Amino acid sequence: MLIMVISTYGQGIDMQAHMESDEAKEAYSDYLQKQASYYTGNCIYDSLLLIEDATLFGRLNALMGATCRIEQQGFSYNSLRDAYVNVDRDLNTQGRIIGYYDGCSLSGVWDNARTWNREHTWPQSKGADKSIAMGHDMQSVRPTSKAVNSDRGNTAYGESSNYYDPNEVAINNSYYRASNNGSYRGDAARVILYDYLVYGAYGGHQNSLYNGNAQLLNKLGTSGVFESLMVLLKWHMQDPPSLTEMVRNDGAQNYQGNRNPFIDYPEVAMLLFKNQQSVTTYTVQYNAPAMIHPRYMQTTPAGFVCYVTDANGSHPANLSVSGAGYLYDATLGRLTITNVSGAVTITVSDVAQDIETTTTSTQNCKYMKNGQLIIMHNGTEFDVLGRPVK
């Protein structure tokens, strides 16, 4: 039995746009194509996973600067109003949009903010004024029910008191969950990550869109935009990207040219902040020989993301994990590991049998073979000292 743990294109499914519908399937297919065509050259997936920290920030920050056309097109805060119907579209009902935080289906026609208005995920008062690109960026300014938007104000996101938690949407002091039974914690985290990546600076890297108020690590706590980096990464990991986010990412790219990499590749967040968080080494065990990218072996305490595929390229239907919390999407084979409490053991059953040797061109995969740690590079096996394995 051979279980490969690899990264593939694809993220998640949410409750308001089921993959079973023809519209959702078509939208997901379009997403995969647009995602694959956007990351080219030194920004292809395999290349991004080989770098981290400031180097990774610089590469993606440059990509954002090169592809974002907000300023070139002369877009403004008012430009967003009529564009939402093509960006935040409700896959179930034409002409309607999905509201931020509550997941409600709203009319896509602008009614002078009587029903919905525009929510600055990164508040205007904390650096994203509507007069500058960051303040009218389609990726981060979202259509939101008027009452819900008023409830949040400019409060920083977080779980403790004095913070705003999108899992506890309140109107007139009455709390309720999002209408699609989903969560907007991860959505909010990924927008904040995006704003930092596009408009911030790190390690000497910044593009022409730089905004000195977009320095995430200086914007933590009640006076900032997030309670802590640890809570942000936790939300990002525990609430993976949904189909609605994917559809929105495509629409935002159509509108202004650039994408949100944290929706396309959630893994890059862990690599980007590796040196800002304590690093934990996880012992990951499988019930069969396996390959796993070494970056997943050392990551932040928030966890890691991997993709499970059997020898025939199918995703196992049955998977369990001990030693950690986990979320598994069998449709995509995506496994999100959270709340690690010890050695992580992943058990997979009912997969294709294969006793033949499988080679791969994937860079720097790590796995165990006959009790020895092996690193695969360009189809050649090396030991931990870099010597070819005979």
Task: Walk through the language-model features, giving the residues of each.
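Short, glycine-anchored, charge-dense loop/turn motifs used at functional sites
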Residues: 382-387
